[in-house]
């Protein structure tokens, strides 16, 4: 076909061959979760934690410091090494141990979402993350497998986000029974089913 159908969404064959497919590999998500001149496993991991898994984490302390926006200012260290040095600060380590392992699996996508195998200086990219439970996530596929294993929490977060959007307000305690019902649908909860349940509630 030369022109895409206007009546339906069609699955694109072979998206995985180009390291594409799904929300986490979407260029817009990868770009907005990057620093201006480099990737940010912290921003990407925070996005996955807050938007996909759902738990809230506190903002960083005022004295947390920051990592330069340009990799050229890392003094020969890799981004992972720079973040490891940052985590030595005990006040930072607690949250970063939850955030960073979810962001590192997306490192093989640059600051504007292009697939890559090495950093601009030629160093190979380690796209693994190790969770606090010592579970290792190997690349984006490992991250996706982990999210599938956390399906109930992912569905609950999606239900909360959809309901908040539909109502145009923050979720209240009185909304929890509906969220529980939506989350209990588990693997049967498609996006359209969640939306229909919210509309009918």
Regions found by a protein language model. Give the residues of each.
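Core structural elements
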Residues: 166-170
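Active-site substrate-binding loop specific to GH73 endo-beta-N-acetylglucosaminidase modules
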Residues: 1-164, 176-191, 196-201
